[in-house]
């Protein structure tokens, strides 16, 4: 385990390199959370993990709250931690331990007005659909007066909003048939569903130039299998949704399109 960094000499780069050096894939964030809480405490925060395992640090007292909300988990995969030509490489350096480290150091240096408290959160399980850390915050805390979300947008960019997302699982099972016969295989039915869904997304988005306002599908996985009697295909699909399209409407469309080929589409 890495040792704490001296608060008198801590920079954002120091904190970021230390944080990136601790693997924290979704569901296994505890070592990084504990280390970050120690660093925040050294910088003057009251810091500890909350009930979901989020790293939470607070400065100041008062009825008004500013929350700087980042996430501490990363997608899987190891990227060697190194600095090359002044650029830090490592899993999560950009998404999103960089913004989180910036929040921690900037928050420690900020001069807070009377009656204002500052809370920095490194949420867990943001990179998976559970969103455990964020859901815990919603369920257990009152809404802050202001929230800044730490996600990569370029050092000089401010993002004003994010599209919604829906993760779908398509599944279809059919009796096995001879390969020379006319019956569609499960894999073919899954491919047909993907084509229908992608076509619907494109038609919905006709005339819309900006990606933020379009429906954008992504086929993340497509697998087929057979036990000799039945063939099965499973597809995992993500939909990015604009403000004008509700998740309920998108799910209803996907369910209808899936049923056309005898399959099902459920929220994953």
Model-flagged regions — what are they?
Residues 65-122:
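Active-site metal-coordination/substrate-binding segment of hydrolases
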Residues 90-93, 123-127, 175-184:
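Flexible, glycine/proline-enriched loop segments at strand-loop-helix junctions
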Residues 51-52, 70-72, 123-124, 150-153, ...:
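Fold-independent oxyanion-binding glycine-rich loops
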Residues 78-79, 156-160, 222-228:
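Short beta-strand/turn micro-motifs at beta-sheet edges
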Residues 28, 48, 166-268:
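Metal-dependent amide/peptide-bond hydrolase catalytic core
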Residues 101-167:
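Acidic/histidine-rich catalytic neighborhood of metal-dependent amide-processing enzymes
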Residues 1-67, 75, 232-238, 249-256:
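N-terminal helical capping/dimerization or prosegment-like subdomains
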Residues 13, 17, 37, 101-104, ...:
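Predominant activation on well-ordered alpha-helical scaffold segments within soluble catalytic domains
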């Amino acid at each position: 385990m890495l040792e704490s960094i001296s608060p008198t000499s801590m920079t954002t780069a120091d904190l970021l390199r230390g944080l990136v050096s601790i693997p924290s894939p979704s569901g296994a964030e505890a070592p990084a959370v504990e280390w970050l809480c120690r660093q925040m405490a050294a910088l003057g925060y009251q810091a500890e993990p909350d009930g979901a395992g989020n790293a939470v640090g607070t400065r100041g007292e008062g009825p008004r709250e500013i929350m700087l909300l980042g996430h501490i988990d990363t997608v899987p995969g190891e990227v060697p931690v190194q600095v090359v030509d002044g650029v830090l490489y490592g899993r999560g350096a950009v998404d999103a331990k960089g913004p989180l480290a910036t929040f921690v150091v900037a928050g420690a240096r900020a001069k807070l007005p009377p009656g204002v408290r500052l809370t920095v959160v490194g949420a867990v399980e943001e990179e998976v659909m559970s969103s455990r850390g964020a859901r815990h915050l919603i369920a257990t805390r009152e809404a802050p007066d202001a929230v800044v979300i730490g996600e990569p947008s370029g050092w000089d960019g401010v993002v004003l909003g994010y599209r919604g997302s829906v993760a779908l699982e398509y599944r279809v099972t059919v009796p096995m048939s001879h390969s020379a016969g006319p019956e569609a295989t499960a894999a073919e039915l899954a491919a047909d569903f993907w084509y229908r869904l992608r076509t619907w997304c494109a038609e919905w988005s006709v005339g819309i130039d900006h990606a933020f306002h379009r429906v954008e599908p992504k086929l993340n996985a497509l697998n087929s299998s057979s036990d000799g009697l039945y063939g099965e295909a499973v597809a995992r699909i993500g939909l990015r949704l604009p403000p004008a399209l509700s998740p309920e409407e998108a799910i209803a469309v996907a369910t209808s399109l899936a049923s056309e080929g005898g399959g099902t589409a459920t929220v994953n």
